[in-house]
Structures are given as structure tokens and as C-alpha cells.
Amino acid sequence: MPIRITRRDFATLAGGFLVSPKAIAQTDTPLVTRAIPSSDERIPAVGLGTAYVFDQDDETTRSKADAVVQALIRGGGRLIDTASTYGDAESVLGKVTAAAGLRDKLFIATKLESPDAQELKRSLARLKTARVDLLQLHNVRSKQQSLERFREWKGQGVCRYVGITSTSRRDYPAVEAVLKREKPDFVQIDYSLDNRGAEKSILPLAAEVRAGVLTAVPYGNGRLFRLVHGKELPDWARVFANSWGQFFLKYLLGDPRVTAVIPGTGDPSHMTDNAGAMRGPLPDPDQRRRMIEFVESL
């Protein structure tokens, strides 16, 4: 059975998760933000995913979530992505943001599996808000799926933007069809340094229809950390990355079609490190090609 190494395990075993802080200043360089194509509103380019990390509504999880959200904000971030199907994540997020009075500081995105008005009502109640910033149709699988109801809700002020999501390459044909026809404000897709299928299809189409792109599972569900276990960050990468986490995120942000990356974490130190990917230079096309070659050589 293969040994599974989490990011926490990796950080401990590496004995030095971060490269020297002199490599890249984390606070005195401009924050990387990206414009939402349909509105030109700018949002910070690193957010927070909540799948599997905030799914239990208990005191321990709420305390952890509060620390992570505070780390996101301190790092310059605003975007938090959740879903009605992520266990108790909406409830945890709602309680944490309400208790700390953080709602107006955040860009909240959630997802529904279908245009069900009652499920929307329950999501808003769990999030303790009357409006979300982004409402997404989750896990698009059919070319016939529509955003008609979502647009109605947008017109009613329930959300500011609408989007679609998928993390399955077999569903890309359906995603492409809905993206072309519905022209949503956002598409959320699986995209990582070792999973680049979206570069050939979804990203070009998103640019064509002026949809923002959110990248889910940017660490490939932990695959990338397992690949680099026991390896030091190459010297050539230290000009733009302070850690392996930033290396992986900055590959994605090096593509200007990507609006934001949304790695999930329940660890505030990892959130701080993730937010650091919004500081300092991004890799240029030649450096991105070298990053691909490096990962493919492992």
C-alpha cells in the first residue's frame, strides 16, 4: 500500500517548509489581484476552499475555521468557496463570520446541485447572510443544464455573480456546452500543475466568453506534495516561491486567465503560506515550462 503524505506530514518531515524569508518579501510587495471579466471588479488571487476541512460543526472545527479565515484576511485574501454538499461547512462558515463580524470583508461563493429554491434558502440560512457574492451550479454533468433560475436569483439580489463547476474531466464536454451557451460569470474547474487538461479546453473557452476561472484542487488532492517529498525547492524557483505550496499555486497564477486559486486548508499556517502566493513575482512562460518539466521528471 502506498504511503500517503499530507501537507502537514510533509511540512514536519521536511524540517523547513519555508525557504528563507529573504527570498520573497511577503508584506511589502503589491498584492496580486485579478479582474472578474464580466464586471472588472478585482478580487485577491488566492482564496480558501472548505471541502473536507470545515465539514463538522463542533467547537474544535469552528475554532480552527476562525483561525484560518483570520489568516486569509491578514494575508490579503477575501474569497471563500463552500457548498451545500460540504457537510456542515456552510454552517461553520456562517457562524464564524457572523460571530467575528467578517461578512462584509469576504467574497463568499457557494454551490447548489440544482436550482432548488428551498435549498438556496437553507444555504443562505446556514451562511447567516441574505446574499452571497457567487452562486454556482455544482458538478455540471449535462449539456442541457441551465442557469436560468440562478440568473433570476441574481436579478433579485440574492447573488452578485453566477457560475458553474466541475472537477471531472469526463464532464468537460458538458461544461464546455453550458459555458458556451450560458456564459456564466465564473467557471470553477480542477486544475493543478500535474492536471493541466483545463488549459486545452476550459481556459480558452472561459476567456472567449469572459468568464472568471476558479481553480479547485490546485494541489491535486495532495499528489503534488507527495511527489516532492524529501526534495528541496530548486534554486531557480526561489526567485518567485517561498515554499512548495507557493510553487504549485504560482504555476496556476502564472496564467492570466486564472482569476483565483482556492486551496482548501484547516491549518492557519498553511493559509498564511498560501496567501504568500499573492506576493512577489509570478513565473513567466519559460519558467512555467520549466516547472512542468520538473514535475514530470519526478
Roles of regions detected by a PLM:
Residues G47-Y52, T82-S84, T110-L112, Q136-N139, ...:
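A cross-domain feature marking catalytic cores of carbohydrate-active enzymes
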Residues T33, V69, E90, G94, ...:
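Generic structural signal for well-ordered alpha-helices
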Residues P30-E41, L124, K200-E208:
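Short amphipathic alpha-helices and their capping/turn segments at secondary-structure boundaries
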Residues D57, S114-Q188, S192-G197, S201, ...:
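Glycine/proline-rich, positively charged
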Residues G94-A98, F107, D273-G280:
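Short, electropositive alpha-helical surface patch
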Residues P2-D104:
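N-terminal binding-site loop/beta-alpha segment at the start of enzyme catalytic domains
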Residues F17, S201-L298:
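Structured C-terminal cap/extension of enzyme domains
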Residues I36, L48, I80, L93, ...:
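Conserved, mostly hydrophobic/aromatic
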